[in-house]
């Protein structure tokens, strides 16, 4: 908190997180999907959200492109702006988890320090790092937005995986092979969520 905000105090809620979770019938957590552009983060997160919705789970998906239309529309792609982008998303995701939602986030989030920042904000027991591990060559072949082509041509600077580093998670809670079928990956995720008692069997 900034020094000039010292008179701003936190007001406790009369309804607790546990009460909200009881109302929803499941825990409030953040599944943080990370991986290269084109790895399948948004696709897998979206398919998982649909599957959870069909099971009556209260969810919300925060997507890297979507938040830049509103919440982070004032930010560019400098290192400082990228860090602020992740900080803001982490704050929103934490609030949503407090509300008892299963929050799915799909962000490249290339730096371990930034992902750790969000983990500490959300809480280690509510933050689940999901690494969608897809080889760069496969991501380039997919290239759904044509970004790799632009980066290779020098038209797009500071692009993760080409001229900007991606720091892969060292010990993610969930490690997915991004070359598998999406249906298989969703099944793996649902099994893990049940095993960890986040959603009901």
UniProtKB/Swiss-Prot annotation:
Signal peptide: none
SUPFAM superfamilies attached to this UniProt entry: P-loop containing nucleoside triphosphate hydrolases
Positions bound to ATP: 35-42
Main enzyme class: transferase
Residues annotated as catalytic: 109 (phosphoserine intermediate)
Gene Ontology biological process terms from the UniProt entry: hydrogen sulfide biosynthetic process; sulfate assimilation
Protein role: Catalyzes the synthesis of activated sulfate.
Stated family: Belongs to the APS kinase family.
Protein name in the entry: Adenylyl-sulfate kinase
The organism's taxonomic lineage, starting at the top: Bacteria, Pseudomonadati, Pseudomonadota, Gammaproteobacteria, Enterobacterales
The gene coding this protein: cysC
């Amino acid at each position: 908190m900034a020094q000039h905000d010292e008179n701003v105090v936190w007001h406790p809620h009369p309804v607790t997180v546990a009460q909200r979770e009881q109302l929803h019938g499941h825990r409030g957590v953040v599944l943080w999907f990370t991986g290269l552009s084109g790895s399948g983060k948004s696709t897998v997160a979206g398919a998982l959200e649909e599957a959870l919705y069909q099971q009556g789970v209260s969810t919300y998906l925060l997507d890297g492109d979507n938040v830049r239309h509103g919440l982070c529309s004032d930010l560019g792609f400098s290192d400082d702006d990228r860090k602020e982008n992740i900080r803001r998303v982490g704050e929103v995701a934490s609030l949503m988890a407090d509300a008892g939602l299963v929050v799915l986030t799909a962000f490249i989030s290339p730096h371990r320090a930034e992902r750790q920042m969000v983990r500490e904000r959300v809480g280690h027991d509510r933050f689940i790092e999901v690494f969608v591990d897809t080889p760069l060559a496969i991501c380039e072949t997919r290239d759904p937005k044509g970004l790799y082509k632009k980066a290779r041509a020098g038209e797009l600077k500071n692009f993760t995986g080409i001229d900007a580093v991606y720091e892969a998670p060292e010990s993610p809670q969930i490690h997915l092979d991004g070359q598998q079928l999406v249906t298989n990956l969703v099944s793996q995720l649902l099994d893990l969520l049940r095993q960890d008692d986040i959603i009901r069997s």
